[in-house]
Amino acid sequence: MFDIQIFLILRSLNESARFMLLLEELIIDSDGDMPIGSGIVAGFDDDKNFAVVLDYTDYETGYNRKTWAVVEKEDALAMADYLKVRLTSLPKEILERFGDWSDIAVPSEVEAVFKDILDFMISCGVRYQLKSNR
């Protein structure tokens, strides 16, 4: 019983400490009933850079890793021009191209989608910088 309470507290704390991006779109999320969760969001950070974020959490151990692919403002504008969409529509564009609402993905599938998004951004001719909290 005690282990379950700790698990639920850690899971709640982790979810409440989640960051927010401006115009954030949830691209894909793994099955919420699994002990390991993973998801991808896209949006704009506080510096108005376009960001795609992979969030990986092992709820049993409390391990959490976030990996950001950050596209600077100028490159994000070039990407929007290339895709013929407004800059503010980039998160929705990524959602439309890579979104998965089935909620049955496993973390490895989520990571594969993140790689596909990175490859797509390169194919649009933009550079990104990878950042991680680990």
Model-derived features with residue positions:
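A short, structured beta-strand/loop element
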Residues: 48-73
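Mixed-charge, Lys/Arg-enriched low-complexity segments
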Residues: 64-134
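Amphipathic, interaction-prone secondary-structure segments
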Residues: 19-50
